Amino acid sequence: MIERIYLAKPRGFCAGVVMAIQAVEKAAVREDKPVTVYHSIVHNHTVVERLSEGGRVHFVEDLDAVDALPDSGDTVIFSAHGISPAVRERARSLGLSTIDATCPLVTKVHTEAKKYAREGYTILLIGDSAGHQEVIGTRGEAPENTILVGVLGKTGPGLNDPHAVQVPDPERLVVLTQTTLSVDDTRKTVDILKARFPALVVPPSEDLCYATKNRQDAVKNIAPNVDAFLVLTSTHSSNGMRLLELAEAECGRAYRLETAADLTRLEQNGDLGGVRSVGITSAASTPDDLVQDVVAHFRALNPALEVIEEGEWENIEFREPKKIAPTQELPRTMQ
């Protein structure tokens, strides 16, 4: 029986996710017709389902599909993961007004990519998947200058091994990263590249976002106190899956949930056998009510359950993105 739960702080929604979700919610109320979101606004099924309720928000993976949507309006919202200039230009050519809900910390990486490309650098972009929306968007800012490098331990189509990647000019080289990677694995990957290419430029401010680091640190702090870890995340959430990997490495037993309903499977499989204390965290795109549902499940089994919250909440807010008409000049940071 679970006697004690340690809830990680921080966990769940980060400032970028809150900004993006609120942008969709406000646009759905403000616009005369339903709004369209390009890609999942954040990588969480529950969030997408809740926003879709009522028919005021549609989600597409291709902007050309907007016209085919019922009662489609002319406003499209870009997801928190960022988009390439090609997608932005396609929206403009289709006459769509846009609301860019890209996380400002992702936009910062885009800005760095454009800067270094203009200066003639080759960009080594560290990521965990060539198909991740954030990687696609960042690479799209400077496709001719960018080489994808798999973060340590990650392989796949389009990802180069940091031990073997080849570059055209080792003297004009900079490293940028996806924002949601393992802090430890990213540091090791950069160290490998720096050892191979001594002239490699590492930007002074880390690309990994504060929320990624803080959530990983919270897992490390709790792990010594628990028998097992539960991580609420979608498999599509990069930061959430990195939390799962970290929890398993630090604790030895870690399980992924999307909702409290998944606990039935764990209990039937005997996965929580012998577990008396459990740590719980959640991806930056996971609503906290899903975490509280898990706590309620265990409390129903043990009314004397002790719940301890470890760590501190963040106090960061991002400005609401503005709507841009298709004929309107883009802000300088988007050019």
UniProtKB/Swiss-Prot annotation:
Location of the active site: 134 (proton donor)
Pathway(s) annotated for this protein in UniProt: Isoprenoid biosynthesis; dimethylallyl diphosphate biosynthesis; dimethylallyl diphosphate from (2E)-4-hydroxy-3-methylbutenyl diphosphate: step 1/1; Isoprenoid biosynthesis; isopentenyl diphosphate biosynthesis via DXP pathway; isopentenyl diphosphate from 1-deoxy-D-xylulose 5-phosphate: step 6/6
Annotated positions binding [4Fe-4S] cluster: 14, 103, 209
CDD domains: lytB_ispH (cd13944)
Any one Gene Ontology cellular component term annotated for this protein: cytosol
Listed cofactors: [4Fe-4S] cluster
Residues where (2E)-4-hydroxy-3-methylbut-2-enyl diphosphate binds: 43, 81, 132, 179, 237-239, 285
Entry binding sites for dimethylallyl diphosphate: 43, 81, 132, 237-239, 285
Residues annotated as binding isopentenyl diphosphate: 43, 81, 132, 237-239, 285
Organism domain of life: Bacteria
Recorded catalytic activity of this chain's protein: isopentenyl diphosphate + 2 oxidized [2Fe-2S]-[ferredoxin] + H2O = (2E)-4-hydroxy-3-methylbut-2-enyl diphosphate + 2 reduced [2Fe-2S]-[ferredoxin] + 2 H(+); dimethylallyl diphosphate + 2 oxidized [2Fe-2S]-[ferredoxin] + H2O = (2E)-4-hydroxy-3-methylbut-2-enyl diphosphate + 2 reduced [2Fe-2S]-[ferredoxin] + 2 H(+)
HAMAP family listed in its UniProt record: IspH (MF_00191)
InterPro entries per record: LytB/IspH
Family listed: Belongs to the IspH family.
Pfam families attached to this UniProt entry: LYTB
UniProt keywords, alphabetically: 4Fe-4S, Iron, Iron-sulfur, Isoprene biosynthesis, Metal-binding, Oxidoreductase
EC primary class: oxidoreductase
Cofactor binding summary note: Binds 1 [4Fe-4S] cluster per subunit.
GO biological process, one term: terpenoid biosynthetic process
EC number: 1.17.7.4
Protein name from the UniProt record: 4-hydroxy-3-methylbut-2-enyl diphosphate reductase
Methyltransferase recorded as keyword: no
GO terms, molecular function: 4 iron, 4 sulfur cluster binding; 4-hydroxy-3-methylbut-2-enyl diphosphate reductase activity; metal ion binding
Biological function: Catalyzes the conversion of 1-hydroxy-2-methyl-2-(E)-butenyl 4-diphosphate (HMBPP) into a mixture of isopentenyl diphosphate (IPP) and dimethylallyl diphosphate (DMAPP). Acts in the terminal step of the DOXP/MEP pathway for isoprenoid precursor biosynthesis.
